[in-house]
From Swiss-Prot:
Multifunctional RNA-binding protein that recognizes the K-turn motif in ribosomal RNA, the RNA component of RNase P, box H/ACA, box C/D and box C'/D' sRNAs. GO terms for molecular function: ribonuclease P activity; rRNA binding; structural constituent of ribosome. Its main location: cytoplasm. It is found in: Cytoplasm. The keyword rRNA-binding applies. This is Large ribosomal subunit protein eL8. InterPro entries: eL8/uL1-like, Ribosomal_eL30-like_sf, Ribosomal_eL8/eL30/eS12/Gad45, Ribosomal_eL8/Nhp2, Ribosomal_eL8_arc. HAMAP family: Ribosomal_eL8. It comes from Methanosphaera stadtmanae (strain ATCC 43021 / DSM 3091 / JCM 11832 / MCB-3). One of its GO terms (biological process) is tRNA 5'-leader removal. Part of the 50S ribosomal subunit. Probably part of the RNase P complex.
Length: 123
């Protein structure tokens, strides 16, 4: 659903799968933020290794500020197709519009790889 106003680039399935894995590892061995309010606060504090935004959010205004804020703070961000899958990877029983990896824990190498590949996508 890359036609959303706030989606600035498409994320290949290979990278999306790695993002799900990194979120799950960080959830279990590090620290993550769940929900747009937590993500926004952590980005503003420069406390995010990777921000993750769902592509299927209606209305788009709920998350439209996140890519702009992340770029302003030079924080890497990525999109995932659905809020349900993002919520599941974040350990929630419901969908979430966004999440962030604060401390990657044992998934630091994976997060570094994702950040590198996302930087290539944006160029």
């Amino acid at each position: 659903m890359a036609n959303s106003v706030y989606v600035k680039f498409e994320v290949p399935k290979e990278i999306a799968d790695k993002v799900y894995e990194a979120l799950e590892i960080a959830r279990d061995t590090g620290k993550i933020g769940k929900g747009t309010n937590e993500v926004t606060k952590n980005i503003e504090r420069n406390n995010v290794a990777l921000a993750v935004i769902a592509e299927d959010i209606e209305p788009a205004e709920i998350v439209a500020h996140l890519p702009i804020l992340a770029e302003e703070k030079e924080i890497p961000y990525v999109y995932l197709p659905t809020k349900e899958e993002l919520g599941e990877a974040a350990g929630l029983n419901v969908g979430t519009a966004s999440a962030c990896i604060i401390d990657a824990g044992e998934g630091q190498e994976l997060v570094d790889e994702i950040v590198e590949k996302v930087a290539e996508l944006k160029n």
